């Protein structure tokens, strides 16, 4: 076999084994050095792939796909800065335990550190953010193909491990790079005879299941049995079964449940939306749980943690299926690595159910106040009404993706809890960046195979503008709702707003670009409703169509700040007179 044939077979073996291991979706960015990999994907009838001119966008698309599908997409790129552009998405995937596979093509050894064009040190470029990284040898008959197959299997296994995360394989290729048909009868290929005749992976990997430690469960049962004022917290959870189990236990035992937006429970009508109550000082002062059991990961809002810092509970227990430390306030007294559902099943009989009524009327008044103050039909659509309307109209046939900063906070605070079942809501909360959001949402929609709505701010929108080119899928359209307050609106809510006269110049960074022109550039439909009624009708109609759409909601940062403060002033007396936990 000549060099071209060896390289062609080498790459086709890699691609085939990836597909057999369940990693059959490829996000490819065009490049010369990655030619053998790209054409190996294109030649495989079982491979699904999409081309991305921008590697940074491709990385976030792969991240979104993994969030939805629960398995890694495979990123393929050429050498040089191409692979470096994956870095932000790799960091997010690592921080939030999302599987990802990176196959980077590289120059051969003699071109490294020799002044050769488009050549950098790519091995271990992502450092500690990968679960595994490996430099493969150059294609050659001296390397057994069986070792190549087992390496591919190991890469997929590590990506899906506990915790899941990115895996990087760096593949050097020597020119010529063009493919050439090869002979499978070659002695080098003979050990793969059975593999070639089957459709099975070279090696099957069973991911370990983490069962709750018996001693830890006994301790937790005792803690909950003796608790006088227990609180359940539902943080970010990937599996609906976990979320439903936690909600069911809280309901059956009569225990207050704080359900974060990322838990999937926040938008259900079975959970009380406590977020706004935690912003009230009277509530925060009187709320003193002695035991907190935190299921899942982090929360969007700071208020619960701030409240608990003032009156630390006697026990703070964390239950999540992740070996990493989750203890930002360093107050955790017991940490259990297991699925929340597995732990919940052991807690149902540990205490008698308690009465926890009287909240329906309170939160009905809260909802009425929000709707009157911010959501009146003929009033301008705003940054409070938009997430509330979206949450009230979206059903199980549609998914939600929410950008960080104000959209995440406002959806968490003001969403209408009307869904019968947990509604799939995703955010990039690993490191909570504002970059790559449109790309992630597009990948999430593709991985979920479901239409999706994205709620995003104007700065995040502009940050990932080229990703609008990805919204051409009629099967899974993306409705992009841009909350345009002409800059970084969140800074108006931070202490710096009152401590500098350079807020706009150094923090808010106003922009006057046309969202409409951006949408038209990418041949996307565009609308800009003025009132809540117009937005409600427009969004309800968009949910019925199989076409992507950009909806711009124009607002003003100062008006938005005033609206939030005015609404809080109207809600505070409601919580204060209720005396929920008054002693």
Curated annotation (Swiss-Prot):
What's the Enzyme Commission number for this chain?
A: 2.2.1.9
Q: What is an example of a GO molecular function annotated in this UniProt entry?
A: manganese ion binding
Sorted alphabetically, which keywords does the UniProt record give?
Magnesium, Manganese, Menaquinone biosynthesis, Metal-binding, Thiamine pyrophosphate, Transferase
Q: According to the record, how does the cofactor bind?
A: Binds 1 thiamine pyrophosphate per subunit.
- Keyword Manganese assigned to the entry: answer is yes
What reaction does this catalyse? isochorismate + 2-oxoglutarate + H(+) = 5-enolpyruvoyl-6-hydroxy-2-succinyl-cyclohex-3-ene-1-carboxylate + CO2
Return the protein name: 2-succinyl-5-enolpyruvyl-6-hydroxy-3-cyclohexene-1-carboxylate synthase
What NCBIfam families is this protein classified in? menD
- Encoding gene (name): menD
Q: Which Pfam families match?
A: TPP_enzyme_C, TPP_enzyme_M_2, TPP_enzyme_N
Query: InterPro entries recorded for this chain?
Result: DHS-like_NAD/FAD-binding_dom (IPR029035), MenaQ_synth_MenD (IPR004433), MenD_middle (IPR032264), THDP-binding (IPR029061), Thiamin_PyroP_enz_TPP-bd_dom (IPR012001), TPP_enzyme_TPP-bd (IPR011766)
> Disulfide connectivity?
none
Q: What class of enzyme is it?
A: transferase
HAMAP family tied to this protein: MenD (MF_01659)
Presence of the UniProt keyword Magnesium in the record: yes
Q: Which cofactor does it need?
A: Mg(2+); Mn(2+); thiamine diphosphate
Q: Which family does it belong to?
A: Belongs to the TPP enzyme family. MenD subfamily.
Question: GO biological process: what's one of them?
Answer: menaquinone biosynthetic process
């Amino acid at each position: 076999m000549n060099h071209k044939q060896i390289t062609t077979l080498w790459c086709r073996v890699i691609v085939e084994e990836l597909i057999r291991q369940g990693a059959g979706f490829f996000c490819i960015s065009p490049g010369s050095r990655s030619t053998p990999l790209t054409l190996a994907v294109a030649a495989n009838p079982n491979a699904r792939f999409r081309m991305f001119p921008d590697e940074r966008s491709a990385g976030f698309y792969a991240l979104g796909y993994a969030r939805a599908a629960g398995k890694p997409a495979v990123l393929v790129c050429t050498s040089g800065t191409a692979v470096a552009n994956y870095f932000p998405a790799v960091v997010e995937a690592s921080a939030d335990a999302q599987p990802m596979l990176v196959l980077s093509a590289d120059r051969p050894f003699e071109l490294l550190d020799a002044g050769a064009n488009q050549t950098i040190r790519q091995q271990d470029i992502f450092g500690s953010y990968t679960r595994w990284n490996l430099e493969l040898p150059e294609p050659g008959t001296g390397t057994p193909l069986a070792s190549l197959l087992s390496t591919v299997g190991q890469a997929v296994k590590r990506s899906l491990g506990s915790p899941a995360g990115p895996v990087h394989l760096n593949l050097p290729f020597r020119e010529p790079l063009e493919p050439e048909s090869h002979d499978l009868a070659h002695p080098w290929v003979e050990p793969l005879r059975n593999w070639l005749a089957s459709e099975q992976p070279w090696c099957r990997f069973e991911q370990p299941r983490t069962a709750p430690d018996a001693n830890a469960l006994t301790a937790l049962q005792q803690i909950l049995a003796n608790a006088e004022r227990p609180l359940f917290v539902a943080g970010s959870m990937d599996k609906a079964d976990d979320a439903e189990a936690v909600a069911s236990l809280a309901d059956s035992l009569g225990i207050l449940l704080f359900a974060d937006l990322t838990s999937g429970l926040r938008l259900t009508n079975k959970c009380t939306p406590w977020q706004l109550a935690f912003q009230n000082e009277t509530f925060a002062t009187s709320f003193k749980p002695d035991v907190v059991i935190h299921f899942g990961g982090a929360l969007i809002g700071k208020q619960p943690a701030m409240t608990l810092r003032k009156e630390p509970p006697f026990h703070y227990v964390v239950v999540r299926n992740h070996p990493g430390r989750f203890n930002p306030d360093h107050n955790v007294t017991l940490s259990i690595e297991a699925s929340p559902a597995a732990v919940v099943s052991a807690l149902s009989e540990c205490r008698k159910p308690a009465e926890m009524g009287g909240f329906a009327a309170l939160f009905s008044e809260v909802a009425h106040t929000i709707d009157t103050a911010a959501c009146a039909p003929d009033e301008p659509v705003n940054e409070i009404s938009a997430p509330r309307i979206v949450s009230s109209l979206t059903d199980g046939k549609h998914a939600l993706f929410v950008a960080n900063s104000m959209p995440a906070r406002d959806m968490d605070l003001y969403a209408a809890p009307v869904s019968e079942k947990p509604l799939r809501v995703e955010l990039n909360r690993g490191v909570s960046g504002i970059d790559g959001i449109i790309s992630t949402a597009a990948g999430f929609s593709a991985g979920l195979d479901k239409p999706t709505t994205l709620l995003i701010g104007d700065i995040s929108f502009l940050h990932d503008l080229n990703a609008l080119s990805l919204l051409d899928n009629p099967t899974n359209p993306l409705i992009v709702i841009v909350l345009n307050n002409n800059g970084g609106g969140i800074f108006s809510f931070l202490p710096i707003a009152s401590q500098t006269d350079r807020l706009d110049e150094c923090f808010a960074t106003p922009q006057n670009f046309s969202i409409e022109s951006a949408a038209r550039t990418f041949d996307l439909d565009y609308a800009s409703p003025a009132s809540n009624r117009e937005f409600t009708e427009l969004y309800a109609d968009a949910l019925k169509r199989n076409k992507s759409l950009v909806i711009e909601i124009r607002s003003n940062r100062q008006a938005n700040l005033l609206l939030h403060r005015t609404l809080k002033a109207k809600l505070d007396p409601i919580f204060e007179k209720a005396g929920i936990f008054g002693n």
